[in-house]
């Protein structure tokens, strides 16, 4: 092996969901929204001055940060915006998980967590779920270098009640606790209210699922101003202009159209509940989904044996 080859950082990469080029398929593999984004996005596109594209975008994403903060009743300095929640989470791992102690996250969860930990050389321990696929809060009461978990979890779609989320935070006030809420709009109560109660909490959300804008790559998180400043310092050390002008403009329109947002989320929740009822009638079993997908199995799967080659 050549010397330069020995110095290559090698990781097992995350495998993104397939994005087929054909249009005549029912695509379910990445939990995208079946409804288009608010029509106000098209209006924003028509208003856009193409000459503006010759200029760099606002590095601080000021207008979008303000729109998000106003919508959720937070201060601007409590909001960080990134290129999708994956970018936000990655920045969080790099910024806050620098201890020799392992970070903790569920063993059945978002598979990107272990990829980031390996990439940034962060030690970690995966905590098992219980027999019903629930996160066990007590497993996170031990010494660690940080905690991250989705709520609702993926791929189980199970929501953990806010009092249990707070129990985990109470037992980990010396480290940063990240609550990944990519699917929170489809069920359950956000941990956002805990941001003003605990200085070590970050709540991460995304435009990709409930706001129908996976193609725009907009993610954000809430935290105390000191955490948000640290995230911005790290972001600006990578690239000052991460969010493009189009995403900023479309994101603002999406946040401001509350009526359309709630209408689409309501349709998806209704469809999910109908699907759960029909799947039960067909003999499927599944945890009680609070996301926009269902983690289902069927007893007949246990009876099938693949033929010998």
Task: For each feature predicted by the language model, list its residue ranges.
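N-terminal "arm"/small-domain region of PLP-dependent enzymes with the aminotransferase-like
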Residues: 1-55, 143
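Conserved small/polar residues in nucleotide/adenosyl-binding loops
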Residues: 304-309
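PLP-dependent aminotransferase class I/II
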Residues: 60, 200-280, 284-287
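Short hydrophobic/aromatic beta-strand micro-patches
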Residues: 222, 295-297
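Helix N-cap motif at beta-to-alpha junctions
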Residues: 299-301
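Conserved core of the PLP fold type I
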Residues: 53-172, 183-198, 202
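Short Gly/Ser/Thr- and Asp/Glu-enriched loop/turn motifs at secondary-structure junctions
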Residues: 287-293
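Hydrophobic residues in beta-strands of the RecA-like P-loop NTPase core, especially within AAA+ ATPase
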Residues: 179-180
């Amino acid at each position: 092996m050549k010397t330069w080859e020995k110095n290559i950082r090698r990781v097992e990469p995350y495998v993104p969901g397939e994005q087929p080029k054909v249009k005549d398929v029912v695509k379910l593999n990445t939990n995208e929204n079946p409804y288009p984004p608010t029509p106000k996005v098209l209006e924003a596109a028509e208003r856009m001055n193409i000459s503006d594209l010759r200029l760099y975008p606002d590095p601080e994403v000021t207008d979008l940060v303000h729109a998000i903060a106003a919508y959720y009743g937070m201060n601007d300095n409590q909001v960080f915006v990134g290129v999708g929640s994956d970018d936000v989470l990655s920045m969080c791992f790099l910024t806050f998980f620098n201890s020799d102690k392992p970070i903790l996250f569920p063993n059945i969860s978002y598979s990107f967590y272990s990829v980031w930990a390996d990439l940034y050389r962060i030690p970690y321990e995966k905590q098992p779920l219980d027999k019903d696929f629930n996160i066990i809060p007590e497993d996170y009461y031990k010494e660690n270098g940080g905690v991250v978990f989705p709520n609702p979890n993926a791929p189980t779609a199970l929501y953990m009640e806010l009092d249990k989320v707070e129990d985990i935070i109470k037992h980990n006030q010396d480290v940063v606790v990240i609550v990944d809420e990519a699917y929170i709009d489809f069920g359950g109560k956000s941990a956002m209210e805990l941001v003003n109660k605990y200085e070590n909490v970050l709540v991460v959300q995304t435009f990709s699922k409930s706001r129908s804008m996976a193609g725009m790559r907009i993610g954000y998180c809430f935290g105390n101003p000191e955490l948000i400043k640290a995230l911005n310092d790290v972001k600006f050390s990578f690239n000052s202009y991460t969010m493009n002008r189009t995403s900023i403009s479309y994101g603002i329109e999406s946040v401001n159209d509350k009526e359309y947002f709630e209408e689409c989320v309501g349709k998806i929740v209704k469809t999910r509940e109908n699907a759960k009822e029909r799947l039960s009638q067909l003999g499927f079993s599944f945890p009680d989904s609070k996301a926009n997908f269902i983690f289902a199995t069927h007893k007949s799967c246990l009876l099938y044996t693949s033929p010998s080659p």
